[in-house]
């Protein structure tokens, strides 16, 4: 065989390699505007950078652009300014509405045609895959707009399945959520998966371009435009440095700009020094300077912060309605605080030190099975917070109490209780709280 033929055969796998992207926004409602704006911005970056449209899979509720509160119907903006681009224009949503669930996300990732009836990941061992998830989270869990949450146990199993099915040469996973650093506990250092998270496993992520900073073309959107970690990496990508900038350099830049939480990276860092363009290809002609993020708010407080801003800025006609909305959000937060305090009290009995430990400790997640079971009990039995657009017992605020469930699981031996007994405590307290809520409503 001629030398040239041998060389061509050796180059054939890389020449045939494809680039894929899976993007998911896990929330719904206008208060969560930023998540769908983030997702569409990510879609535009993938498309603009040369990833084939048929290789980009986007799932989100897709309700914000058409929401009656949107001052620009049919449009979404991910940054402020008079020249801010409409990221919704040309943003092709593959899965929208009530079908967007955690299970659908997992089915798409693993190429399961039984569960996902539309586009799925069809990548091979020669391909590179980029996954981007944006939404609310807590220790070991992230939310979806419909159905149950996604647990770290399920995500871990899915990534291992993708590895065993040889679905990628390299996979990069960017996750925007509170406590997102808790979602990748067992990535191998040589597993060809690099995960980057908006926060560590014990802190909130942050929204940005909120309040007075949410001005677009002379109008205030009335909701945060983006998330600090997400806009940081995307506005960095918008600078058009893909061909030369490495993942390591981008992570360092994004870490510096994401100054309210600790950006973390997990897994295989052997390709950190490779150019981002190897995963996402290279952008040309994008040289605008990224504006510095302003108006950042702890993601846990965005609902109450936005409601307060809306009340302050409401006209006389809307003042009472805005106040009622603000009061409802504050009351719902207080109910969540009280509910999880009661769960801790019931588990501990009359032991103040134990209660303090259950509610305040930052134990590490080890017993995933127990934590998953208790988290499911909250989803199934606790009151649904309409003010937080929740579809189960978890919402963007109370997901911070996922840590309490972790503490219960890791302390169950000292408590003298098994998983079933802890589950019963949650069922009873949530059912009682739900009954009180229904009586009030």
Locate each region found by the language model.
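Cysteine endopeptidase catalytic domains of the caspase/legumain-like
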Residues: 3, 9-441
């Amino acid at each position: 065989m001629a030398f040239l033929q041998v060389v061509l055969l050796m180059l054939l796998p890389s020449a045939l390699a494809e680039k894929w992207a899976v993007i998911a926004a896990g929330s719904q409602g206008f208060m969560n505007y930023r998540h769908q704006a983030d997702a569409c911005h990510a879609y535009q970056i993938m498309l603009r950078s040369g990833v084939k449209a048929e290789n980009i899979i986007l799932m989100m509720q897709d309700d914000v652009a058409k929401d009656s509160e949107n001052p620009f119907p049919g449009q979404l903006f991910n940054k402020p300014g008079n020249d801010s681009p409409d990221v919704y224009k040309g943003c092709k949503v593959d899965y929208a509405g009530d079908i967007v669930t955690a299970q659908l996300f997992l089915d798409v990732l693993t190429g399961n045609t039984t569960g996902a009836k539309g586009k799925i990941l069809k990548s091979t061992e020669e391909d590179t895959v980029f996954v981007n998830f944006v939404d609310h989270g807590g220790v070991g869990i992230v939310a979806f707009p419909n159905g149950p949450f996604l647990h770290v146990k399920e995500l871990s199993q899915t990534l291992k399945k993708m590895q065993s099915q040889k679905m990628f040469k390299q996979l990069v996973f960017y996750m925007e959520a509170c406590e997102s650093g808790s979602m990748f506990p067992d990535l191998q250092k040589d597993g060809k998966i690099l995960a980057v998270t908006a926060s560590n496993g014990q802190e909130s992520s942050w929204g940005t371009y909120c309040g007075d900073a949410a001005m677009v073309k002379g109008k205030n959107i009335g909701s945060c435009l983006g998330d600090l970690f997400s806009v940081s990496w995307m506005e960095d990508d918008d600078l058009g440095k893909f061909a030369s900038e490495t993942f390591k350099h981008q992570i360092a830049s994004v870490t510096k700009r994401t100054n309210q939480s600790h950006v973390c990276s997990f897994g295989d860092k052997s390709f950190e020094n490779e150019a981002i363009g190897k995963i996402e290809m290279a952008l040309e002609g994008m040289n605008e300077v990224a504006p510095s993020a302003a108006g950042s708010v702890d993601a846990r407080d965005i609902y109450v912060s936005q409601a307060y801003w809306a009340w302050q800025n409401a006209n006389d006609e809307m003042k009472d309605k805005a106040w009622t909305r603000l009061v409802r959000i504050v009351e719902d937060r207080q109910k969540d605080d009280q509910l999880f305090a009661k769960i801790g009290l019931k588990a501990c009995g009359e032991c103040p030190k134990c209660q303090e430990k259950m509610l305040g400790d930052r134990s590490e997640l080890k017993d995933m099975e127990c934590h998953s079971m208790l988290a499911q009990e909250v989803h199934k039995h606790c009151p649904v917070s309409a003010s937080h657009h929740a579809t189960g017992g978890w919402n963007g605020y109370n997901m911070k109490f996922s840590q309490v469930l972790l503490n219960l699981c890791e302390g169950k031996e000292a408590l003298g209780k098994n998983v079933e007994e802890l589950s019963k405590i949650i069922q009873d307290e949530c059912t009682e709280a739900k009954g009180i809520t229904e009586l009030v409503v």
